[in-house]
A protein has these predicted regions:
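N-terminal substrate-binding region of glycoside hydrolase catalytic domains
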Residues: 29-32, 174-264, 288, 365, ...
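Conserved, mostly hydrophobic/aromatic
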Residues: 121, 181, 203, 231, ...
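Aromatic-lined carbohydrate-recognition surfaces of secreted/lumenal glycan-active proteins
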Residues: 175-184, 286-289, 309-345, 366, ...
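Amphipathic, heptad-repeat alpha-helical segments
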Residues: 1-22, 57-122
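Aromatic-rich peripheral "rim/lid" segments of glycoside hydrolase catalytic domains that contact
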Residues: 279, 293-294, 298-305, 312, ...
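Long amphipathic alpha-helical scaffold segments
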Residues: 127-186, 190, 194
Length: 495
């Protein structure tokens, strides 16, 4: 078993740093390795099954940026401890420098205010390295370097987004990217319908199996029939699904009696797929056939079972709708869940296995619920977000992205999961203002990416049952949050 050791200063950091136990080591392919975190005094011990060089990924307190996940450069194991702040500063500078080279090679004009920040971060890192005989002093200089380089990364990425959007708007006065939201599993009130239409040109009709067939043979189509009719009347681009949710509690409860009988279970799944696609054939042309098969958790399905099931679902769906487009929802695309040691495949390896097998996938939908645990994604800065999208683009499939971000931290009575809000994960504590500003920062980045064909918000109203607590754009009382105004401004600006 391999062990990587890091010295943490100031030592009092551990007193209010619960995120430390979600840290993990990753390889050169960015896949997370099963990692056990231990704290001993001021030492952070990262235990894993191999001794290969790797990167420590950890949510680190950065004034002005919240607690974004930072990564060290690739480090070999050694007997004496690394100074964690120094290695995080080095890793951030390397990341930004590498991305700078890529964007320069693509012809990007580098903003003038980036250079002094980047240079100052280098200078501070050099000072921290020079005084490593005093870990506390080295950590102080390294922390200053991290702050400067995070500022530099934000300046650089904002400039990239601005330049890319300018180019895209020269090609398309109205962006070809679909901007949509889920209609939820209950009818929208008339005022909510207007709120929806003012912000979006696309709609996801959930068609979730557990709501359509809560008891075997008892189908309830009324809400979804009405949603499809309403979407077509208002000329919205419709996406159906996810039809099958392979996360915990995502399938109908009555199906649990078949969880140890895979072949009968597969038969039930395929029958439902055929039924729902046949019902809306010709009205819905884009189908999200399955959600969260990479992380899983539904019934007793193994990783291999889920791969086989998704392949069979795709086969049946294509037989029913020969002209349809079929996409797969991948959750937690950075793959933090692998650190728990229950998965062999990273999210990208899971999707790649289907692509290499010749499955008829039209696109990948990345579900990114920022600021949630344990089944969400930790906060990351703009440049990290951009790099993740670029990495997924390597698969050669168009991308859709489904987003969620909390507007409050307390318990949400309408949430359908046990997800909790990490209130301090982003630069502003979880609030309606934070949600609005996050949308204004991150949605334009996605719109700047040609590989992203659609951006969807997870749900409109917090009055509906929903997966991500407080992620709606409308309060339970029907009043729009600040985030809804941000969505409307983006719609007016880009479409």
């Amino acid at each position: 078993m391999g062990v990587m050791r890091f010295a943490v200063h100031p030592t009092g950091l551990f007193d209010d740093w619960p995120e430390v136990h979600r840290a993990y080591i990753s390889g050169v392919d960015q896949a997370a390795w099963p990692t056990r975190i231990e704290v001993a005094g001021n030492q952070l011990l990262c235990r894993r099954q191999n001794s290969d060089s790797g990167k420590l990924n950890i949510a680190w307190p950065v004034p002005g940026f919240g607690r974004p996940v930072l990564a060290t450069a690739s480090l070999p194991e050694r007997q004496h401890s690394y100074i964690l702040a120094v290695e995080l500063a080095r890793g951030k500078i390397v990341q930004v420098r590498n991305q700078l080279a890529v964007w320069q090679a693509a012809g990007m004009a580098i903003p003038e205010d980036f250079v002094p920040l980047h240079r100052e971060a280098h200078r501070l890192l050099a000072r921290s390295v020079a005084v490593q005989h005093d870990p506390a002093e080295a950590s102080e200089f390294a922390q200053q370097a991290i702050i400067k380089e995070c500022e530099a990364a934000e300046v650089l990425t904002r400039s990239y987004v601005s330049q890319r959007l300018e180019v895209r708007h020269r090609q398309y006065p109205q962006l070809p990217t679909v901007f949509g939201c889920s209609l939820g599993d209950s009818p929208l009130a008339p005022e909510q319908q207007q709120q929806f239409l003012s912000g979006f040109n696309g709609a996801a009709v959930p068609l979730q199996w557990r709501y359509i067939e809560p008891e075997e043979g008892d189908y309830r189509w009324e809400t979804y029939d009405a949603q499809v009719d309403w979407g077509m009347e208002n000329q919205l681009l419709l996406r159906g699904g996810p039809l099958v949710d392979l996360s915990p509690n995502g399938l109908p409860k009555w199906l649990s009696q078949w969880e140890h009988d895979y072949w009968n279970l597969q038969s039930f799944v395929c029958d439902f797929i055929e039924t729902v696609i046949s019902r809306y054939l010709g009205r819905i042309r884009i189908w999200e056939i399955a959600a969260r098969p990479n992380a899983g958790g539904a019934l007793a399905l193994t990783e291999e079972n889920r791969l086989t099931l998704v392949a069979k679902i795709l086969e049946v769906a294509r037989q029913v709708d020969q002209e349809g487009q079929f996409l797969l929802r991948i959750d937690q695309p950075w793959g933090e869940y692998q650190a728990r040691g229950q998965h062999k495949l990273s999210p990208m390896h899971f999707a790649d296995a289907l692509v290499r097998a010749g499955m008829d996938l039209s696109a990948i939908n990345l579900e990114i619920g920022v600021g949630y645990s344990p089944m969400g994604s930790a906060s990351r800065d703009l440049i990290d977000f951009s790099r993740m999208i670029d990495q997924w683009s390597v698969l050669g499939l168009p991308l859709q992205v489904t987003l969620a971000f909390p507007s409050a931290a307390e318990h949400d009575p309408n949430q359908t999961t046990d997800l909790e809000v990490d209130a301090r994960s982003w630069k502003i504590l979880a609030s309606e203002e934070a949600q609005a500003r996050w949308i204004e920062d991150y949605v334009p980045l996605l719109l700047a990416k040609p590989s992203v064909l659609a951006v969807f918000w997870n749900h409109l109203s917090d009055a509906q049952p929903h997966r991500f607590p407080h992620a709606g754009l409308v309060r339970p009382d029907g009043q729009a949050k600040a985030a809804h105004a941000s969505i409307v401004r983006l719609r007016e600006l880009h479409w």
